[in-house]
Amino acid sequence: MTKQSFLSYCVTTYNTSPDYPFDEDFETAVLRHGDNRKWYALVMRVSRRKFGFDSDEVIDVVNLKLPTEMFGSFGVADGVYPAYHMNKLHWISILLPDAPDDIIQFLVNVSFEATKDKRKRRKTTE
């Protein structure tokens, strides 16, 4: 999946547009809820070397928040790694060019739900 197709999926599915909150950095995009402003995704460019590859190729990566019980369900074969530059107890990194689209979409859906306003989450589960 490309960065643009990922962002398009989020715009279409969640009606959220990317935010570029970092000065002078117009490549790193944050996707957040409209009501509580919590991040559910961070898209950035990172060297493959940061994930243990012997390559300096810079690729698009998305960080997503997962419930702790889901950690270990996905692995590097799925393009899923411990989070780069975020709390590894709560976040994962997905290498967009390496991960299957269905896994990316599933995990962004999980992240979106995990970062919803708690009152809204309760209503949807009742």
Regions found by a protein language model. Give the residues of each.
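Charge-dense, helix-prone N-terminal extensions
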Residues: 1-126
